[in-house]
Regions:
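RNA-binding accessory domains that recognize and position tRNA/RNA substrates
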Residues: 1-157, 168-172, 178-179
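Cysteine-nucleophile active-site neighborhood
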Residues: 159, 165-201
C-alpha cells in the first residue's frame, strides 16, 4: 500500500468480501495502532493476525512502486530478520504460483437467493457484494468452482451465465478458456446468446 499511514479506520467483518483473506503478505509504510471509526471492531493488525497474513512495516512503499513500474513483476518474500541468507535465496528461487484463481475459487457449488431468474456464476474470485447485488434483482444464483465443466453448468439449465472477475493473468488460465470455448459450441449456450437470456462478465 502506497498511502503513508494504513489502518486508520480499523476493520469490521461486516465489510468482508470473501470467505477469508487470500493475499500472502502486506507491505506498508506505517501501521495505525489506534483507529478512529465508529464501526471499527478491531485494528488492522488484529485482523491480519487472525488471517495469518504477515506484515512488513517501516518500508518506503512508494519507492517499491516505482521499481515495479520500471521493471515489472519482481520476485520477493517476507521473512524473519534472523533467517539465514541461503534460506532466503531458496525461497526466492521457488517457482511462482501462476494459477491464482485455483486458490480463491469456491471449493464446492453453492446457491444464493431465491429469485425468479436462475443465474449460473463461475467463481474466479468473486466478491460477496456482487453476488448479493445480483440476487437483489430477483435472481437465484448457483455458484460454480472455476474449473467446472461446461456440461455441468449447462445441466443446471440457467437463464444466464455470469463470468466473475478474479486475480491473476487470463493467459495463465488456458484450461478454463478452452472450456468456455467448448461451452460456446453447446446448443443450449447458443440459445442463451440468441434469446432474451444473457451471458456476461
Amino acid at each position: 500500500m502506497t498511502y503513508p499511514l494504513v489502518g486508520n479506520y480499523g476493520t469490521n467483518d461486516l465489510f468482508n468480501q470473501g470467505r477469508k483473506s487470500f493475499f500472502q503478505g502486506y507491505v506498508i509504510s506505517e501501521l495505525c495502532d489506534h483507529p478512529s471509526n465508529w464501526r471499527c471492531e478491531k485494528t488492522l493488525e488484529q485482523f491480519l493476525d487472525e488471517q495469518d497474513v504477515p506484515v512488513l512495516t517501516g518500508v518506503d512503499t512508494r519507492a517499491i512502486t516505482r521499481k515495479l513500474r520500471n521493471y515489472g513483476v519482481l520476485q520477493g518474500v517476507i521473512v524473519p530478520a534472523e533467517m539465514p541468507q541461503e534460506e532466503v535465496e531458496k525461497l526466492l528461487a521457488t517457482p511462482e504460483v501462476h494459477d491464482q484463481v485455483a486458490t480463491v475459487t469456491t471449493p464446492e457449488i453453492y446457491t444464493l437467493g431465491n429469485g425468479k431468474y436462475h443465474v449460473a456464476v463461475m467463481d474466479f474470485g468473486i466478491k460477496q457484494n456482487i453476488l448479493e447485488y445480483l440476487a437483489s434483482f430477483d435472481c437465484h444464483l448457483t455458484v460454480f468452482p472455476a474449473y467446472t465443466t461446461a456440461e455441468e453448468i449447462l445441466a443446471a439449465r440457467p437463464d444466464g451465465i455470469f463470468l466473475a472477475n478474479g486475480p491473476g493473468d487470463p493467459k495463465d488460465l488456458q484450461p478454463i478458456i478452452e472450456e468456455l470455448k467448448a461451452d460456446r459450441q453447446e446448443a443450449y449456450f447458443r440459445h442463451l446468446l440468441r434469446s432474451s437470456n444473457f451471458s456476461f462478465g
